[in-house]
Amino acid sequence: MDQPTILVVDDIPENVELLEAYLVPEKYHVVTAYNGIEALEQAKETPPDIVLLDVMMPQMDGFEVCQTLKNDPKTQFVPVVMVTALKERDDKLRGIEAGADDFLTKPIDRVELLTRIRSLIRVKFLHDDLEKSYVELQE
């Protein structure tokens, strides 16, 4: 299995560095973006296996980024984990409506982060295998 690619998106460099410090030792390939527009460009350039997405960002917030990713056929099945300091129920509902697959509340618990990532990547890889098999059957 290839090294899974994780797109980490946060406008605060220290938050990005913290997530990288958790992920790189676990053998994940980390790609970073510091705003929503950059995140969408990175997702096109280097298709991720999962996106860790901050909610509160300038220019384009995480809800908009998530919705854009989920509306794009090339990224619609990429799991998106909203990473947020927001704890309101309405914010979580808005994230679900935008297509988020999971939520993590700041401050991030390292063990919880890694467990959720492993679970979502496993599902993503199963989906990719199923899609590949379907295409092969169609040929």
Identify what each model region corresponds to:
Residues 58, 106:
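A Lys-centered signature of the CheY-like receiver
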Residues 57, 80:
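Receiver (REC) domain active-site loop signature in two-component systems and cognate sites
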Residues 120, 125-139:
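Amphipathic alpha-helical coiled-coil "transmission" helices that mediate dimerization
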Residues 46-55:
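Active-site beta3 strand of CheY-like receiver
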Residues 4, 13-37, 45:
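Two-component/phosphorelay signaling modules centered on CheY-like receiver
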